[in-house]
Amino acid sequence: MLVKKIDIHVHSCLKRGTPRFDLDFSDYTTPGELRRMYDELGIEKGVQLPEIGVECGGHFIGNEESYELVRTHPETYDWFCNIDPRWGLNSDQTNFSYLLNYYKNLGAKGVGEICANLYFDDPRVMNLFAHCEACDMPVIFHIGSFPYGDYGLVDELHLPRLEKVLKTFPKLMFLGHSQKFWAEISGDLTEEDRDGYPTGPVAPGGRVVELLRKYPNLCCDLSAGSGENAIRRDPEFGYAFLEEFQDRLYFGTDICAPHNEMGLSKYLD
């Protein structure tokens, strides 16, 4: 008998809203749709991640709606709250602990997915991380490009800014996600391949592997095509990676719409 999985990364809505123009004009899953998908995939429940960023198009899912999903469908959802570092007059002095503790008292287990299109070490982002660390709230981040046409925290090839924040906030758990994170699993990554799904054998010296070995506060979110590709592109490496870092890898789907396919779930089964 297979053990049912917990999904660290899902986006749902209570009811249909504005079609998302960044997602082929479909919308998020409703609780009933997600439950049917989970039952087919052998997933017990998932962590709802609010979508609050201006970089994400169409239907925004706030903290209150996400909490309501958990309150009305506790068999399907846990949740993270989400905070944009620019909230609070776009200042690097905003007291985010007030909000974090408020949502933590409502059962939020962390913060994410952080998609603000700012540098990892922007003072406003560093301020948010400091409050997350103080409130013991792990964060899930998406890595993007800057300044146009993308979403997510910004870093250069080989993730020097991510290393800076890992070093600065040793008690804060970071969960890495997205193409620009998972492409760094291979040591031969180039700038041209950062935003895609590289194929072929994984070369030694990958930055993600190096950072995992160096910083115990870095964990990984295996969701979406990027996480699946990192594990499946080189099966021998993938098995070894899963074995070495098994206590710091979180299964996820990143289900955003009812038609999404989840190859990693079946592969791991």
Locate each region found by the language model.
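Short, acidic/polar
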Residues: 27-38, 88-103, 204
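Generic structural signal for well-ordered alpha-helices
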Residues: 31-35, 63-70, 96-100, 125, ...
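An N-terminally biased module of ancient metal coordination in phosphate/nucleic-acid-related enzymes
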Residues: 1-64, 110
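A short, flexible beta-alpha/helix-coil linker loop
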Residues: 13, 18-20, 52-54, 85-86, ...
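Active-site gating/metal-coordination segments in enzymes
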Residues: 45, 56-157, 224
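Active-site gating loops and adjacent loop-to-helix segments of metal-dependent hydrolytic enzymes
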Residues: 11-29, 40-41, 74, 178, ...
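Active-site neighborhood of phospho(di)ester-bond hydrolases with catalytic His/Asp-centered motifs
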Residues: 5-8, 47-50, 80-82, 112, ...
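Catalytic pocket-lining loop regions of alpha/beta-barrel enzymes
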Residues: 109-110, 125-251, 259-263
